[in-house]
């Protein structure tokens, strides 16, 4: 245990992450597996972004939000996996206290953005299918940017609040965390200070960023399902369902793992179940998301060929913002991105 002295108390200056396993024979195998998972996630996500930028059929609000959703997926896996890989090939599994706080902040920042963007995408599907006549005015370019900006502000506020609330806690006993990355509520179990306020803040965050978005997503898709079932055309029903099925799959994986993780606040100690759920939440889910959305893109025939349609007036440059990060396409301004191109008159 690495301790520093402050007066008569021993203060923890580092934590020790036990990681996935302490079995030396398994570590090289796990290193290769998670390295491949990391490369697959980065490659798949960049492919999705490239397709959205270059294919005019994808210049609709739904894929604008998908492009923004891809960024926190890359961020989440980049916050956790590289450090885990280094632990597989190093005997030093310690992490400085401040580095632990930084990891926790960025993870909650990116995971929070995921929560809000998934909710926005459900609302977008509701407008596109249930309010199609007014969709273009209700989901204008300005509104798209405002929604993404709000998701950044809310997720940043929550991440900063949780991190600032954790920083004054005293850790004067064991410093071993039975996990492979720093996240709540594991540090609570090691604190020799009261964590009552921290528990309340985490509960409020879970309600605001977990329960409320999940309720909104459920209500949105209840209306969508009712509207789709009223469509007489089999092709129309298939197209509507295809634009929603991939998103519902991602929502199920994301919230399924998140609910399990943050309902274990009362557990006495971390278990291997927490590590398994952590792997699903931080590695498997971001890796599957590009594969799921690629399947959806293929289903709607958006990736099979480059659009050859002409005569569409150019809109604003392709811009995507997430948590104050923006990228601008090094291409000519795409047709119709400001609202909807003729190929996406109903956001589909």
UniProtKB/Swiss-Prot annotation:
- Keyword Signal in the entry? The reply is no
Q: Where are the transmembrane segments?
A: 29-52, 61-82, 104-123, 144-161, 200-222, 240-262, 276-295
Taken from the record's topology, the Extracellular segments are 1-28, 83-103, 162-199, 263-275
CDD domains according to UniProt: 7tmA_OR3A-like
Indicate where this protein is primarily found. Answer: membrane
Membrane topology recorded in Swiss-Prot or TrEMBL: Multi-pass membrane protein
Alphabetized Pfam families for the sequence: 7tm_4 (PF13853)
Q: Which residues lie on this side of the membrane: Cytoplasmic?
A: 53-60, 124-143, 223-239, 296-348
Subcellular localization(s) per the UniProt record: Cell membrane
So which residues have sugars stuck on them? 8
**GO molecular function terms attached to this record:** G protein-coupled receptor activity; olfactory receptor activity
Top-rank taxon of the source lineage equals: Eukaryota
UniProt-listed GO biological process terms: sensory perception of smell; signal transduction
Which UniProt key words apply to this protein? Answer: Cell membrane, Disulfide bond, G-protein coupled receptor, Glycoprotein, Membrane, Olfaction, Receptor, Sensory transduction, Transducer, Transmembrane, Transmembrane helix
The cysteines joined by S-S bonds are 100-192
- What Gene Ontology cellular-component terms does the record carry? membrane; plasma membrane
- Entry-linked PANTHER family: OLFACTORY RECEPTOR
What does this chain do? Odorant receptor.
Homology family: Belongs to the G-protein coupled receptor 1 family.
Q: What is this protein called?
A: Putative olfactory receptor 3A4
Query: Which organism's genome codes for this protein?
Result: Homo sapiens
Encoding gene (name):
OR3A4P
């Amino acid at each position: 245990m690495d301790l520093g002295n402050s007066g008569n108390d021993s203060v923890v200056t580092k934590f020790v992450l036990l990681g996935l396993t302490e079995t030396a024979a398994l570590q090289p195998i796990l290193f290769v597996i998670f390295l491949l998972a990391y490369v697959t996630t980065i490659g798949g996500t960049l492919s999705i972004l490239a397709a959205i930028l270059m294919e005019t059929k994808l210049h609709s609000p739904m894929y604008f939000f998908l492009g923004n959703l891809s960024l926190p997926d890359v961020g989440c896996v980049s916050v956790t996996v590289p450090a885990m890989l280094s632990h597989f090939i190093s005997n030093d599994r310690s992490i400085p206290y401040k580095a632990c706080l930084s990891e926790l902040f960025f993870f909650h920042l990116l995971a929070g953005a995921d929560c809000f963007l998934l909710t926005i995408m459900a609302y977008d599907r509701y407008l596109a299918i249930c309010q199609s006549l007014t969709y273009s005015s209700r989901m204008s370019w300005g509104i798209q940017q405002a929604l993404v900006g709000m998701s950044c502000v809310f997720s940043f506020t929550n991440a900063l609040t949780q991190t600032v609330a954790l920083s004054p806690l005293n850790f004067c006993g064991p410093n071993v965390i039975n996990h492979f990355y720093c996240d709540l509520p594991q540090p609570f179990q090691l604190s020799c200070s009261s964590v009552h306020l921290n528990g309340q803040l985490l509960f409020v965050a879970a309600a605001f960023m977990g329960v409320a978005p999940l309720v909104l997503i459920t209500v949105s898709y209840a209306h969508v399902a009712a509207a789709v079932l009223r469509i007489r055309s089999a092709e129309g029903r298939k197209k509507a369902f295809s634009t929603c099925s991939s998103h519902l799959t991602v929502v199920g994986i994301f919230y399924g793992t998140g609910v399990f993780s943050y309902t274990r606040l009362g557990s006495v100690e971390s278990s291997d179940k927490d590590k398994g759920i952590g792997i699903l939440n931080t590695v498997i889910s971001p890796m599957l998301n590009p594969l799921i959305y690629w399947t959806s893109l293929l289903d709607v025939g958006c990736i099979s060929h480059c659009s050859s349609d002409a005569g569409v007036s150019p809109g604003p440059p392709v811009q995507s913002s997430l948590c104050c990060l923006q990228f601008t396409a090094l291409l000519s301004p795409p047709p119709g991105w400001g609202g909807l191109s003729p190929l996406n008159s109903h956001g589909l």
